Amino acid sequence: MPAIEIGRICVKTRGREAGKKCVIVDIIDSNFVLVTGPKEINGVKRRRVNILHIEPTDKKVEINKGATDQEVKQAIEQSGLTDFIKEAVKPKIPVI
């Protein structure tokens, strides 16, 4: 199971959206991915994120590369993970 893959649900660990869950929509390069909440579900905007600032979970939704927010929302609802996405978690702060 690759940790960083399209459709993987992750927890943001840094920034103003820390603790919220998001879905990987596209892999930009070896350091950045495109994620979305989508915003209507939990308030996470579609944006580029450093892979060091997200923590993958064991859950995944089936979406295509570059899926729109509506497609992601439908995939989450079909998977029955809406409540899982909405609940915030306390992110693990890495020790530096």
Swiss-Prot record:
GO cellular component: cytosolic large ribosomal subunit
UniProt xrefs under Pfam families: KOW (PF00467)
Biological processes per GO annotation: ribosomal large subunit biogenesis; translation
Keyword Ribonucleoprotein: yes
Top-level lineage group: Archaea
InterPro entries, per the entry: KOW, Rib_uL2_dom2, Ribosomal_eL14, Ribosomal_eL14_arc, Translation_prot_SH3-like_sf
GO molecular function: RNA binding; structural constituent of ribosome
Keywords tagged on the record: Ribonucleoprotein, Ribosomal protein
HAMAP family xrefs: Ribosomal_eL14
Listed NCBIfam families: PRK04333.1
Family: Belongs to the eukaryotic ribosomal protein eL14 family.
Protein name: Large ribosomal subunit protein eL14
Species in which this protein is naturally found: Sulfolobus acidocaldarius (strain ATCC 33909 / DSM 639 / JCM 8929 / NBRC 15157 / NCIMB 11770)
